[in-house]
Amino acid sequence: MTAENRGFCQLICHINVRIGWTIFGIVFGISAILTYAIKFHNWSATATTAIATLFACETLYLYWALKKNTIVNWKSSTFQLMIWPNVFIGLLGLLGCLVCYIIAGITHQGAGSIQGWSLFKCSIYFSKFAAMYGENLWFTGSWSLVITKWTWQNAFFARKYLNKIGTASEDGDIDDDDVEVIKS
C-alpha cells in the first residue's frame, strides 16, 4: 500500500467520518419511517426501516465507545454476545429481502409508476407515483437489505475488537490505529 493510499484510507476510515455517516444513516432512517408511515401508509416498510434504524443506533453506540476509548473496558463476552445475534438477524434480513423481491415481482408491484399521466389532456387520472402508496414489498425488501448491512457491520466490528482484546491479553495492550485518545 502506498503512502497516498494509506493517507486516503486514514481520512475515509477515521472514526469521526464513520460517526458522521452513521448519524446520516439514522437521520435518513427516521425520515423514511415518517414518510412511509404518514404519506405512503406502507406499514411493512415502516417497521423494517425502524428495525434498520435501531441497528444503525447500535453502530453509533459502538463507534462512540471506540472514539471515547471506553470500548477497552468491555468484556469479551459483550462482543461475543453481539456477534451471533447480529449475524443471524442479518441473515433474516437477507432472506426477507429475497422473499420480498420475489413476491413483489410475482404480484407485479411497482416501485414507481407513471400510468395515468396524460400530457395531452393536462390532467392526472391517478397519482404519478400510485404504486408507492400502500403496501409495497420493493421498499420493504430494500430496507431488509439495509438491516443486513447494519447488523453484519456490527458483527464484523465486534469480531474485530474481540480479536484485539484476545491479542491484547497476550501483549498487555490494545492499540487501534483508527482512534486518537484525547486526554483532558
Swiss-Prot record:
Protein name per its UniProtKB record: Heme transporter hrg-4
Natural source organism: Caenorhabditis elegans
Sorted UniProt keywords: Cell membrane, Glycoprotein, Membrane, Transmembrane, Transmembrane helix, Transport
The UniProt record lists the keyword Cell membrane: yes
Annotated transmembrane regions: 19-39, 46-66, 87-107, 124-146
GO terms, molecular function: heme binding; heme transmembrane transporter activity
One Pfam family cited in the UniProt record for this chain: HRG
Gene induction: By heme deficiency.
One biological process term in Gene Ontology: heme transport
Compartment(s): Cell membrane
Recorded family membership: Belongs to the HRG family.
Membrane protein topology class: Multi-pass membrane protein
Knockout-associated phenotype: RNAi-mediated knockdown results in the heme accumulation in the intestine under low heme conditions. Simultaneous RNAi-mediated knockdown with hrg-7 results in defective heme deficiency sensing.
Coiled coil start-end: none
